[in-house]
UniProtKB/Swiss-Prot annotation:
PANTHER family: REGULATORY PROTEIN RECX FAMILY PROTEIN. Modulates RecA activity. This is Regulatory protein RecX. One of its GO terms (biological process) is regulation of DNA repair. It is found in: Cytoplasm. Belongs to the RecX family. It comes from the Bacteria. The lineage of its organism: Bacteria, Pseudomonadati, Pseudomonadota, Gammaproteobacteria, Enterobacterales. HAMAP family: RecX.
Length: 166
């Protein structure tokens, strides 16, 4: 039987928590730090883990060392996941920025992902508005606004009608 959590050192409790968090899905380092520093729900309500900054650094280092935490892998999987859900490059970049991923890492991963964003934009437009895509101005504006909200770039959106006209 395991010993009560109050008797376990803060480092051990943090490490256990980090592994449980990372077992569910990949996280960026910043996300993991935020989740580790948040209070834990205990039997008597939220409980703080009385860990030092050194404990947090040791846990993060352990996760990197044992390949539980890898920002590059996280970025590639995040881009693949969000693009499968129909989101464009601008929105994905913004979400990665919010998750603490550097602009350089994001741009490198976006170049390596080999996704045809204009084709994805067309698929999203067809899924929402049907085939053939609207050709009158007011309907085109609706499609454009929808795709911009989903995070597609204006060049990719305009490419839809250029290819459609050909």
């Amino acid at each position: 039987m395991s010993e009560p959590t109050s008797r376990r050192p803060a480092y051990a409790r943090l490490l256990d928590r980090a592994v449980r968090i990372l077992a569910v899905r990949d996280h960026s380092e910043q996300e993991l730090r935020r989740k580790l520093s948040a209070p834990v729900m205990g039997k008597n309500g939220p409980e703080e883990i009385d860990a030092t900054a050194d404990d947090y650094e040791r846990v993060i280092a352990w996760c990197h060392e044992h390949h539980y935490l890898d920002d590059e892998r996280f970025v590639m999987r995040f881009i693949a996941s969000r693009s499968r859900k129909g989101y464009g490059p601008a929105r994905i970049r913004q979400e990665l920025n919010q998750k603490g991923i550097s602009r350089e890492s994001t741009e490198k991963a976006m170049r390596e992902c080999e996704i045809d964003w204009s084709e994805m934009a067309r698929e999203q437009a067809v899924r929402k508005y049907g085939e053939p895509l609207p050709s009158n101005f007011s309907e085109k504006v609706k499609v454009q606004r929808f795709l911009l909200y989903r995070g597609y770039l204006m060049d990719d959106i305009q490419q839809i009608w250029r290819n459609f006209a050909d």
